[in-house]
Structure formats: C-alpha cells, structure tokens
C-alpha cells in the first residue's frame, strides 16, 4: 500500500496518508484562493481512517494549519480528509485532477483541464 507523507514549512506538523485518494481536484473558490494566496488549490481527498498527523494544529473555517509557521495542510472532516497536495514531502506527479470546482471563479487565462469534470460551484 502506498504511503505518502507531508508537513508544514517548519516541520512542527507532519502527516501520513495510506492508499490512493478517492478523488483529486482543483478549487477556484474565493475561500481557497484567499487561504492559499494563489489562483486555485490543488487537493486530494482520502478516507479519514487512512490519515494520521502529529504536532499541534490550529483550525480556521475548517482548514487546519501549523500555528507556528502558518502552513496550510488539510481539512479534517467526519469521513474524509482533504489534503493540500503542495504540502506533500514528494511532489504528487502521479496525481492529476479528476475535476475542477468553482470554475465560475477560475481566472480567464486558466483553461479547463482536459478530461476533468467541470463544476460551476461545488461538486455534489
């Protein structure tokens, strides 16, 4: 079984996740843009039971981060964990987005990803 590890910038918070993600996506919503400081967030969703972390985390608006360096890492939900893929220790070059959400807010210079589902808002 594949194990992926990740951490914040300062290393105070680390995590590991086992297996393959349920789905991989890009989000262009205003909240993701503001919390990341970028035009979109590249993320993947795993079952909650496949995820574990160490170190103290802080959470704001459902998004967990390191209180020391501010690194945004994951969103813990009841059944799933959404991980920001830029926080992985090894680049996730084998993971490609299955879908894009909040494309009504996507920058006009960004083109739809071929083969990825396109959703004006959240995917249901």
Each predicted region: which residue ranges?
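A short Gly-Trp-Pro
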Residues: 1-124
């Amino acid at each position: 079984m594949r194990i992926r590890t990740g951490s914040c910038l300062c290393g105070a918070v680390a995590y590991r996740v086992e297996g393959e993600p349920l789905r991989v996506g890009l989000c262009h919503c205003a909240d993701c843009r503001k919390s990341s400081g970028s035009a979109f967030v590249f993320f993947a969703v795993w079952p909650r039971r496949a995820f574990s972390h160490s170190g103290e985390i802080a959470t704001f608006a459902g998004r967990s981060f390191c209180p020391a360096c501010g690194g945004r890492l994951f969103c813990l939900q009841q059944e799933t964990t959404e991980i920001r893929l830029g926080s992985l220790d090894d680049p996730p070059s084998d993971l490609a987005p299955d879908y894009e959400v909040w494309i009504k807010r996507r920058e006009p210079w960004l083109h739809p990803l071929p083969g990825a589902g396109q959703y004006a808002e959240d995917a249901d």
